[in-house]
């Protein structure tokens, strides 16, 4: 019997490819996705850019995926972290860790095209796209999924990779814990008068964190957080006003901000499932947890989930175990628990730490940034998580 994956965004598509590679096509996978990846309306493969940590790129290379993404990626050679209006900062450089890059920035629409090209020829993978789940039945020994096309699939384990507030997981009785941050993330691609040269920036401002990631064609991908109550004001700004405000918040490290492209915005919250497994069902990626974009940890955490689950399922199959058995799924959950809790905790703490303008706390966090800049062991702690070198 097979693995049935619902959701063909980054997490679901990568999981299908990982299982195919690790099992050499011996473990059948059905991947169900409602929207063709070529569509600009695809919610998982839109115009956004994401940063893949070096550790994530290494894992993608291991399963033969990175080789197809490398030509559309932009290397991050330096990360500069600072607190606006204060002296504290820390810089991470790839050369300090004998690396060519700390990570890579990719545009999701480009990634979607390449992942689905790989999926169409991956041994053991059957694509059901575009198609949707009409009904799910879970029995003691298997799962049965009926598609809107009328086809019925039978498998040992069901994977929810259908994003935040997963409809599949909800239908399977999973509860959610959510903490709204009362913040809005504004996303745009911007142009600057000074070349980024692979530099990425994380800047904490009075309104919220601001990240600039290097992209192709000299552009930068911007994620700029604002209090939720400023939504109407920020979204009403003209291009010129937006660039002026961004210049004031970001500074002149990349010279003049000359252009801002189409802007989109969404509210931010920490959302995570109370449990990542239930009867013959596993949650991965944003279906398991959706984090604040601060420090770019969410997607890389999801990729560690994906790789660990692929290994757990293929190992169970090799041993002749029922891979949907609760004991097998518990092994996966226990394996991921420490990293998941730590990453959620660190990300959530950073949001609250840098949102607080209480003077003693501001002084303390700037001392912390300066300490990391001056003392290599302290800086290495930040680097390990930035690089995605985290035990799975």
UniProtKB/Swiss-Prot annotation:
InterPro entries, per database record: FAD-bd (IPR002938), FAD/NAD-bd_sf (IPR036188), Ubi_Hdrlase_CS (IPR018168), UbiH (IPR011295), UbiH/COQ6 (IPR010971), UbiH/COQ6_monooxygenase (IPR051205)
GO terms for biological process, alphabetical: response to light stimulus; response to oxidative stress; ubiquinone biosynthetic process
Keyword list, A-Z: Cytoplasm, FAD, Flavoprotein, Monooxygenase, Oxidoreductase, Ubiquinone biosynthesis
Cellular location(s): Cytoplasm
Family annotation (Pfam families): FAD_binding_3
Cofactor dependency: FAD
Cellular component GO terms held in the UniProt record: cytoplasm; ubiquinone biosynthesis complex
First-listed, main subcellular location of the protein, grouped into a coarse class: cytoplasm
Pathway recorded for this protein: Cofactor biosynthesis; ubiquinone biosynthesis
Disruption phenotype: Cells lacking this gene are photosensitive and are not able to grow with a nonfermentable source of carbon. They also fail to produce ubiquinone, and accumulate 2-octaprenylphenol and 2-octaprenyl-6-methoxyphenol.
UniProt-listed Enzyme Commission number(s): 1.14.13.-
Top-level taxon of origin: Bacteria
GO MF annotation terms: 2-octaprenyl-6-methoxyphenol hydroxylase activity; FAD binding
Record note on quaternary structure: Component of the Ubi complex metabolon, which regroups five ubiquinone biosynthesis proteins (UbiE, UbiF, UbiG, UbiH and UbiI) and two accessory factors (UbiK and the lipid-binding protein UbiJ).
UniProt family annotation: Belongs to the UbiH/COQ6 family.
PANTHER family named among the record's database cross-references: 2-OCTAPRENYL-6-METHOXYPHENOL HYDROXYLASE, UBIQUINONE BIOSYNTHESIS MONOOXYGENASE COQ6, MITOCHONDRIAL
Summary of the function given for this chain in its UniProt record: Is likely an oxygenase that introduces the hydroxyl group at carbon four of 2-octaprenyl-6-methoxyphenol resulting in the formation of 2-octaprenyl-6-methoxy-1,4-benzoquinol.
Protein name per UniProt: 2-octaprenyl-6-methoxyphenol hydroxylase
Organism lineage string: Bacteria, Pseudomonadati, Pseudomonadota, Gammaproteobacteria, Enterobacterales
Gene behind this protein: ubiH
């Amino acid at each position: 019997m097979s693995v049935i994956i619902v959701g063909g965004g980054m997490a679901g598509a990568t999981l299908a490819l990982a299982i195919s590679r690790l099992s050499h096509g011996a473990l059948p996978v059905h991947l169900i996705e409602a929207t063709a990846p070529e569509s600009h309306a695809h919610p998982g493969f839109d115009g956004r850019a994401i940063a893949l940590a070096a550790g994530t790129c290494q894992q993608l290379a291991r399963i033969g995926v990175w080789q197809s993404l490398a030509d559309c990626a932009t290397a991050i050679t330096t990360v500069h972290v600072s607190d606006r209006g204060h002296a504290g900062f820390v810089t991470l450089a790839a050369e300090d860790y004998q690396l060519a890059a700390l990570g890579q920035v990719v545009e999701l629409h480009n990634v979607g095209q390449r992942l689905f090209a790989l999926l169409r020829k991956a041994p053991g993978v059957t694509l059901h796209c575009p198609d949707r789940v009409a009904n799910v039945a879970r029995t003691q020994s298997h799962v049965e999924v009926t598609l809107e096309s009328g086809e019925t699939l039978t498998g040992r384990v069901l994977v929810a990779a259908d994003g935040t507030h997963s409809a599949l997981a909800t239908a399977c009785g999973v509860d959610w814990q959510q903490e709204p941050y009362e913040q809005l993330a504004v996303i745009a691609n911007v142009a600057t008068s000074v070349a980024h040269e692979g530099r990425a920036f994380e800047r904490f401002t009075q309104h919220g964190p601001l990240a600039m990631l290097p992209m192709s064609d000299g552009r930068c991908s911007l994620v700029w957080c604002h209090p939720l109550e400023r939504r109407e004001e920020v979204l009403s700004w003209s291009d010129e006003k937006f660039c002026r405000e961004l210049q004031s918040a970001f500074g002149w490290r990349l010279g003049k901000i000359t252009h801002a492209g189409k802007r989109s915005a969404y509210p931010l919250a920490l959302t995570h499932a109370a449990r990542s497994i239930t009867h013959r069902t596993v949650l991965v990626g944003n279906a398991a947890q959706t984090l604040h974009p601060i420090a770019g940890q969410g997607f890389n955490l999801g990729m560690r989930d994906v790789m660990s689950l692929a290994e757990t399922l293929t190992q169970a199959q090799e041993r002749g175990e029922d891979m949907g058995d609760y004991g097998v799924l518990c092994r996966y959950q226990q394996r991921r628990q420490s990293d998941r809790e730590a990453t959620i905790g660190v990300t959530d703490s950073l949001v609250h730490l840098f949102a607080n303008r209480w003077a003693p706390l501001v002084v303390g966090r700037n001392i912390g940034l300066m300490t990391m800049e001056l003392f290599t062991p302290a800086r290495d702690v930040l680097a390990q998580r930035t690089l995605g070198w985290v035990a799975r």
